[in-house]
């Protein structure tokens, strides 16, 4: 019998080696006392992305490699087919979140019987200066 999770985090990846370590680190540091899996769908990267993921050696991370580039939407859809979580969280490889994001969104969804929750989106330049609220 396969393991079920409270949350499946789906990360589509294409040539993201310069961002990937930061993305993985923040996911592995989540202050979340429920079970979750990190599904990384590599969309035929030609850089070092797969090696960066493999070096993490975490049982939470599941790497799926696509033979050809199909785009981020297709990679997300493949992640959805693989996901075993009650809830799904999408994160792009060049994004970052706070270490309490999964806990906050999951708690809010469960306590209010919501099917969908989301947080604010802010654009941050490389200098880490807040640029603007997007959503």
What are these model-derived regions, one by one?
Residues 1-135:
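Nucleotide-sugar donor-binding/catalytic module of glycosyltransferases
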